[in-house]
A protein has these predicted regions:
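Structural micro-motif
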Residues: 47-61
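Structural motif
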Residues: 40-46
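Generic recognition of short, well-ordered alpha-helical segments
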Residues: 14-18, 44, 73
Length: 87
């Protein structure tokens, strides 16, 4: 299972929710979705994982491989990243 960190009022995150909805409609549930802008505990977890690699949300993360994607991405970027994760 992957994790998608987002901010509730983040416009870039809203677009990525749409992308995840479409992806998961095809492939099943892949992501835990974690809101961090209004949840200090989850924000601290994200900061520990991020290690200043991205510095914000949207942040897609695979805890098994410690790989990630940052920011608003294109559908093909997510598709390629997921394939690289050997689903």
């Amino acid at each position: 299972m992957f994790t998608f960190y987002y901010g509730k009022d983040c416009p870039h995150c809203a677009k990525m929710h749409e992308l995840l909805d479409a992806t998961e409609k095809k492939q099943g549930k892949l992501f835990d979705r974690v809101e961090v802008w209004h949840n200090e505990e989850e924000l601290k977890k994200l900061e520990a994982i991020d290690k200043d690699r991205c510095g914000g949300v949207p942040f897609f993360y695979n805890p098994k491989t410690d790989t990630y994607l940052c920011g608003e991405i294109e559908p093909n970027e997510l598709e390629t990243w997921l394939k690289e994760q050997e689903l």
